[in-house]
C-alpha cells in the first residue's frame, strides 16, 4: 500500500537540531503575535523612505546618462 509506505517513511525520519535552527527559533516563536500599538511600523516607514531615496538617486543617474550633448539631428 502506497499510503502505508508514505506514513511509515514520515514516522521513520528524525529531525536534526542545527545551530542555525536553534538561533532562529526565537523568531519563529513570535509567529502570530500582534505587537502592542504601532509595533515596527516606524522602522518600516524609515526603510521605505530610504528605499525611495535610493530609487530616486538611481533614476537621476539613469536620466543623466540619457542626455546627449552636442548631438545635432538633421
UniProtKB/Swiss-Prot annotation:
A GO molecular-function descriptor: phosphate ion binding
Domain of life: Eukaryota
Subunit structure: PSII is composed of 1 copy each of membrane proteins PsbA, PsbB, PsbC, PsbD, PsbE, PsbF, PsbH, PsbI, PsbJ, PsbK, PsbL, PsbM, PsbT, PsbY, PsbZ, Psb30/Ycf12, at least 3 peripheral proteins of the oxygen-evolving complex and a large number of cofactors. It forms dimeric complexes.
Function comment: One of the components of the core complex of photosystem II (PSII), required for its stability and/or assembly. PSII is a light-driven water:plastoquinone oxidoreductase that uses light energy to abstract electrons from H(2)O, generating O(2) and a proton gradient subsequently used for ATP formation. It consists of a core antenna complex that captures photons, and an electron transfer chain that converts photonic excitation into a charge separation.
GO CC, any one term: chloroplast thylakoid membrane
Pfam families xref list: PsbH
Lineage: Eukaryota, Sar, Rhizaria, Cercozoa, Chlorarachniophyceae
Keyword Coiled coil among record annotations: no
Family the entry assigns: Belongs to the PsbH family.
Keywords: Chloroplast, Membrane, Photosynthesis, Photosystem II, Plastid, Thylakoid, Transmembrane, Transmembrane helix
Predominant cellular place of this UniProt entry's protein: plastid
Topology relative to the membrane: Single-pass membrane protein
Identification of the protein by name: Photosystem II reaction center protein H
Transmembrane segments annotated in the record for this chain: 42-62
Subcellular location: Plastid, Chloroplast thylakoid membrane
InterPro entries: PSII_PsbH, PSII_PsbH_sf
Listed GO biological process terms: photosynthesis; protein stabilization
Amino acid at each position: 500500500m502506497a499510503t502505508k509506505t508514505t506514513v511509515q517513511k514520515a514516522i521513520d525520519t528524525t529531525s536534526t537540531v542545527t545551530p542555525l535552527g536553534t538561533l532562529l527559533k526565537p523568531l519563529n516563536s513570535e509567529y502570530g503575535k500582534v505587537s502592542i500599538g504601532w509595533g515596527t511600523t516606524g522602522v518600516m516607514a524609515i526603510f521605505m523612505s530610504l528605499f525611495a531615496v535610493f530609487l530616486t538617486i538611481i533614476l537621476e543617474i539613469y536620466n543623466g546618462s540619457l542626455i546627449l550633448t552636442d548631438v545635432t539631428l538633421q
